[in-house]
């Protein structure tokens, strides 16, 4: 029969080894210094070795103590992790969501705390991407992407359209009276080549060759426009905070709908989703509808 493990003594040893001080270990464990010392002494007697030597300013691990410590630390961490998997009688589920960065900061993160408060049993992991993601290969439960929804082997659910317009710094906006004034500034580009031409068409003006730098991050483009005579074509709803703070400006009420934000799921899992994924799916669809109504 396996000997009964002296868990209190092992916890006392591990805390004492971290602090090299019985008093500090006792404060962490909410017991007295004498109680910690006694627990360590009990463990030493069971093992037949000394785990610490007493030095003027505290404790020092013996060779035997240093040999024992990593195994005890790992075991206690594993027990703690096992307990963390439960919340109020329910096993916690890990949910991994890959989110395009613009949506993550502009929409999801301001709302995710409310979702977690409603569903504390869900342990959510948020990964950001630049619209390229492989759900199956990367072990991702769901993704939020920008585009027109034509991705293969996925179920694609439109959350909302994302009309694009020009944003720039407040100073730059002072020189932009009509759309053709954009020739005076450097236009920043994304990897989607036709975006500016689509906006020029919506503005009723002829396109011109754009040579501004190409960015793989819309967020980075907005950081750039704050620095000089730049303009970026972006989904302005995702930058409402910056517009409200007047760190960026919207010189024209001209919009081009270039795509939307989509929730994408593996087709092979559509009918076999975890409870956590189903709850998240219902939540984000509901809140997206509310967002559209308010917009």
Curated annotation (Swiss-Prot):
GO terms for molecular function: DNA-binding transcription factor activity; sequence-specific DNA binding. InterPro entries: LysR_subst-bd, Tscrpt_reg_HTH_LysR, WH-like_DNA-bd_sf, WH_DNA-bd_sf. The keyword Glycosyltransferase does not apply. Keywords: Activator, DNA-binding, Transcription, Transcription regulation. One of its GO terms (biological process) is DNA-templated transcription. It comes from the Bacteria. The keyword Ribosomal protein does not apply. This is Carbapenem-hydrolyzing beta-lactamase transcriptional activator. The lineage of its organism: Bacteria, Pseudomonadati, Pseudomonadota, Gammaproteobacteria, Enterobacterales. This protein is a positive regulator of gene expression of carbapenem-hydrolyzing beta-lactamase (NmcA). Belongs to the LysR transcriptional regulatory family. Signal peptide: none annotated. Residues 22-41 bind DNA. Residues 5-62 form the HTH lysR-type domain.
């Amino acid at each position: 029969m396996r000997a009964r493990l002296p868990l209190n003594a092992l916890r006392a040893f591990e805390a004492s080894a971290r602090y090299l001080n019985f008093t500090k270990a006792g404060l962490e464990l909410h017991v007295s210094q004498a109680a910690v010392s006694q627990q360590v002494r009990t463990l030493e007697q069971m093992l037949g070795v000394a785990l610490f030597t007493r030095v003027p300013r505290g404790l020092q691990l013996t060779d035997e103590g240093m040999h024992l410590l990593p195994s005890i630390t790992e075991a206690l961490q594993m027990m703690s992790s096992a307990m963390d998997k439960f919340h109020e009688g329910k096993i916690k589920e890990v949910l991994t969501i890959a989110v395009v960065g613009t949506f993550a900061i502009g929409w999801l993160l301001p709302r995710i705390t409310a979702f977690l408060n409603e569903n504390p049993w869900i342990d959510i992991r948020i990964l950001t991407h630049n619209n390229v993601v492989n759900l199956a290969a990367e072990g991702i439960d769901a993704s939020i992407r920008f585009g027109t929804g034509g991705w293969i082997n996925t179920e694609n659910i439109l959350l909302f359209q994302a009309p694009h317009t020009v944003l720039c710094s407040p100073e730059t906006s002072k020189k932009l009276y009509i759309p053709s004034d954009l020739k005076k500034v450097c236009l920043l580009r994304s990897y989607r080549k036709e975006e500016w031409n689509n906006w020029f068409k919506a503005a009723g003006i002829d396109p011109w060759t754009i040579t501004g730098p190409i960015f793989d991050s819309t967020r980075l483009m907005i950081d750039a426009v704050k620095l000089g005579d730049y303009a970026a074509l972006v989904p302005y709803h995702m930058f409402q905070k910056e517009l409200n703070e007047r760190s960026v400006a919207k010189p024209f009420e001209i919009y081009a709908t270039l795509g939307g934000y989509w929730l994408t799921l593996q087709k092979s899992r559509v009918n076999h989703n975890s409870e956590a994924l189903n709850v998240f799916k219902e939540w984000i669809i509901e809140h997206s509808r509310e967002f559209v109504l308010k917009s």
